[in-house]
Amino acid sequence: MSNRWRFVVVVTLFTYCLTFERVSTWLIRSGEPVQHPAEFPFIAFLTTERTMCTGSLVSTRAVLTAGHCVCSPLPVIRVSFLTLRNGDQQGIHHQPSGVKVAPGYMPSCMSARQRRPIAQTLSGFDIAIVMLAQMVNLQSGIRVISLPQPSDIPPPGTGVFIVGYGRDDNDRDPSRKNGGILKKGRATIMECRHATNGNPICVKAGQNFGQLPAPGDSGGPLLPSLQGPVLGVVSHGVTLPNLPDIIVEYASVARMLDFVRSNI
């Protein structure tokens, strides 16, 4: 098999796995567990009956996440804030009232909902808004994270922060390997050296950290600092023949601002 076709097959498999029922998302591999919920008061934990995703509160009634997180045949049934782990009784829980998927991602969304293979990756458009049935109470400690400016697209070499509830096969604690634990990490922006759709932001593990998003982190934010703004949303991972590690593609929020602003 040629390198070109091997690349197409690998990308297709990654995308299909991330949108299927049992593996809907991407982990902060080798990440550091967050010790206090107030460190990321804007982070949301999205769950269906079988899967989980990460999101960011961008208005008092809207959570920004990945399109593939809401395109599963299983709907999101709960959105939790100020929670460090799955099942945390101290968190604040909300019910979703609806979702808005970016138009550019709808071909992949329809395929996922109908359980059909994804024809092509649309990671640059992989953005959705989950609307909440009730406004969050900002007096509770939950915070809204700011959106970027249209020019806020980080250049290659930029150090960034990543946050999410994903699984971590590198965690020495067996109870934390399957995800549902909020972790943070560092990574680096790189030039996308492969064919993409929607002009995503490509991210590689930081040279001294080895941390990347993984299943469960999908929809999680790409941050220039721990306070924001949210520059990107985790879409999916890609393996390239010349690189030893996975490259993670993020949908650029700056490039999707019109959609986001009109739906929050």
From Swiss-Prot:
Alphabetical list of Gene3D superfamilies matching this protein: Trypsin-like serine proteases
Pfam families attached to this UniProt entry: Trypsin
Coiled coil: none
Expression sites by tissue: Acetabular (penetration) glands.
Keyword entries, A-Z: Disulfide bond, Hydrolase, Protease, Serine protease, Signal, Zymogen
Stretches assigned to the Peptidase S1 domain: 28-264
Transmembrane segments: none
Disulfide bonds: C53-C69, C192-C202
Residue ranges annotated as propeptide in the record: 20-27
InterPro entries reported in the protein's UniProt record: Peptidase_S1_PA, Peptidase_S1_PA_chymotrypsin, Peptidase_S1A, Ser/Thr_Proteases_Immune/Dev, Trypsin_dom, TRYPSIN_HIS
Example GO BP: proteolysis
Protein activity control: Activated by an autocatalytic mechanism.
Signal sequence segment: 1-19
EC numbers: 3.4.21.-
Catalytic center residues: H68 (charge relay system), D126 (charge relay system), S218 (charge relay system)
Domain of life: Eukaryota
MF term (GO), any: serine-type endopeptidase activity
Similarity comment text for this entry: Belongs to the peptidase S1 family.
Job description of the protein: This protease cleaves elastin and thus facilitates penetration of schistosome parasite larvae through elastin-rich tissue of the host.
Protein name: Cercarial protease
Organism lineage string: Eukaryota, Metazoa, Spiralia, Lophotrochozoa, Platyhelminthes
